[in-house]
Structure formats: structure tokens, C-alpha cells
Amino acid sequence: MGREQRQFIQMIAALTMLIDHIGMVFFPSAIGFRAIGRLSFPLFAFGIAEGVRYTHRFWRYFGRILLTAVLSQPIYMLLFGITQGNPLFMLAWGAAALYFFRQGKRAVAAVLLIGSYFADMSYGWYGVWTIFCFGLYVERESLCFYGQLLLNILYGLKTRAWIQLLSLFSFGFLD
């Protein structure tokens, strides 16, 4: 995947997230905004997985995500009235799990993957596992898609947020 395609994916992710958040704040009963917004997270997760894959200084990359998470947490809490960790904490967690897996430290990765179920952060285990799936994307595209399908079904069973299944359409941007 070339640089221009990665930038296009980042732009689509940001735009669909903006639409989702506009809907959440200003039009909470308009489901269309939320439906469009379902495309954003998998694209961000893909970007994190690609970042882990290509960065030469993982801990600097990880630190930037974590610092942004800490600095944006008060705004997130104020704007959305939510006390759980914002999605950037989950992105950092997922990046760490994937990094340790790629470094051959499978036990550490497993602890992070399992531990994500108990963490109080936006997208939680679903988000961490989504990043992990996308980390395997390069070599196993169909496995990633079916892994995402399974994650979405499990997420739907746990949260009743079946709208998240629409996130599978994000794969259309990754070809």
C-alpha cells in the first residue's frame, strides 16, 4: 500500500469520525451519523497496526499516542460526560499488544489482549483485538476479515450495539 492510499485512508477515518461525533453531540437520535461513523474506528485501527509495523522507534510512537490520550482525556470527559479512558488509551494498548507479539513476546501480548477485557476504556477489548487483527492483515487478509466479523458478533452480543457490524464495510477502503 502506497503513501497516498494510506493518507486517503487517514482522511476517510478522520472525516467519518467527525461525522459520527457531530451526530453524537448535535443529533443524537439521527442514526445515519452513527452508521457512517462506524467506518472510522477500523480505519484508525489499521493505521495503528501499520504504524507499529513501519516505525523504527516504537516507544516514541507509543509515547506520542499515550501523551495525546492523557492530554485529551479532560476534554473527552467534559464533552461527552464519560469517565472511562478515551479511545487513544485503547489505541496505545492495542499498539503495545501488537508490538510485543511482533517482537516474539507472546506471553506479554497475551496478557495485554486478555487484560483489555477488564480495562475501562472506550472500545476496550474490541478495539485492542481489532488492532491486533489488522496487525495480521498484511499476511492474512481473509483471516483478518473473518476475525473482525467474529469480533463484531461478540461485541454485538455483549453490548447489543449491532450497528457496529457496519464497520466491516471499512474493508472496502483497504484493497
Which residue ranges define each predicted feature?
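Alpha-helical transmembrane segments and their immediate juxtamembrane cytosolic regions
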Residues: 1-175
